[in-house]
Amino acid sequence: MSVDQETVKRVSHLARIAIHDDEIEPMTKELNVILGFVEQLNEVDVNGIEPLTSVMPMALRMREDSVTDGDKVADIVANAPVTEENFFLVSKVVE
């Protein structure tokens, strides 16, 4: 895969990055070099190798899931000017 000047313009527009006409050609070359490095990574044989989440061995601590209200209801509704039965009361905005 290679990047052309139109692709650079399109990507810069989508990313909302201002790029001047004199910067398009060098950017095209730079992106093609980067893609070349990525294509080299595709040549590496990784069959039989487990994916890593970290270079340090980690064990997941398991716990039983339990549903709670967070014990913060009083703190949360304390910020509202008007509440009813632990719900915020607001004026009707749609008729």
Curated annotation (Swiss-Prot):
InterPro entries: Asp/Glu-ADT_sf_sub_c, GatC
Keywords, alphabetical: ATP-binding, Ligase, Nucleotide-binding, Protein biosynthesis
One protein family per Pfam: GatC
Keyword ATP-binding: yes
Gene3D superfamilies (alphabetical): Glu-tRNAGln amidotransferase C subunit, N-terminal domain (1.10.20.60)
Catalytic activity: L-glutamyl-tRNA(Gln) + L-glutamine + ATP + H2O = L-glutaminyl-tRNA(Gln) + L-glutamate + ADP + phosphate + H(+); L-aspartyl-tRNA(Asn) + L-glutamine + ATP + H2O = L-asparaginyl-tRNA(Asn) + L-glutamate + ADP + phosphate + 2 H(+)
GO biological process, one term: glutaminyl-tRNAGln biosynthesis via transamidation
Keyword Iron-sulfur: no
Broad enzyme group: ligase
Signal peptide from the UniProt entry: none
One GO MF term attached to the UniProt entry: asparaginyl-tRNA synthase (glutamine-hydrolyzing) activity
Protein EC: 6.3.5.-
Subunit structure: Heterotrimer of A, B and C subunits.
Function: Allows the formation of correctly charged Asn-tRNA(Asn) or Gln-tRNA(Gln) through the transamidation of misacylated Asp-tRNA(Asn) or Glu-tRNA(Gln) in organisms which lack either or both of asparaginyl-tRNA or glutaminyl-tRNA synthetases. The reaction takes place in the presence of glutamine and ATP through an activated phospho-Asp-tRNA(Asn) or phospho-Glu-tRNA(Gln).
Family per similarity comment: Belongs to the GatC family.
Protein name, UniProt field: Aspartyl/glutamyl-tRNA(Asn/Gln) amidotransferase subunit C
Organism of provenance: Bartonella quintana (strain Toulouse)
